[in-house]
Swiss-Prot record:
NCBIfam families: rpmJ_bact
GO cellular component: cytoplasm; ribonucleoprotein complex; ribosome
Lineage of the species this protein comes from: Bacteria, Bacillati, Actinomycetota, Actinomycetes, Micromonosporales
One MF annotation (Gene Ontology) recorded for this entry: structural constituent of ribosome
Family matches, as SUPFAM superfamilies: Ribosomal protein L36
Organism: Salinispora tropica (strain ATCC BAA-916 / DSM 44818 / JCM 13857 / NBRC 105044 / CNB-440)
UniProt keyword annotations, A-Z: Ribonucleoprotein, Ribosomal protein
Protein name: Large ribosomal subunit protein bL36
One Pfam family cited in the UniProt record for this chain: Ribosomal_L36
Length: 37
């Protein structure tokens, strides 16, 4: 899980979602997981 000030999709399988008021990226590739914070 990478924590970044701005999250972006890295590949086509990345999905940007909101969870508990946080913007997150979930993906089939675990290295692409990101959270805004």
């Amino acid at each position: 899980m990478k924590v970044k000030p701005s999250v972006k999709r890295i590949c086509n399988k990345c999905r940007v979602i909101r969870r508990h008021g946080r913007v997150m990226v979930i993906c089939a590739d675990p290295r692409h997981k990101q959270r805004q914070g």
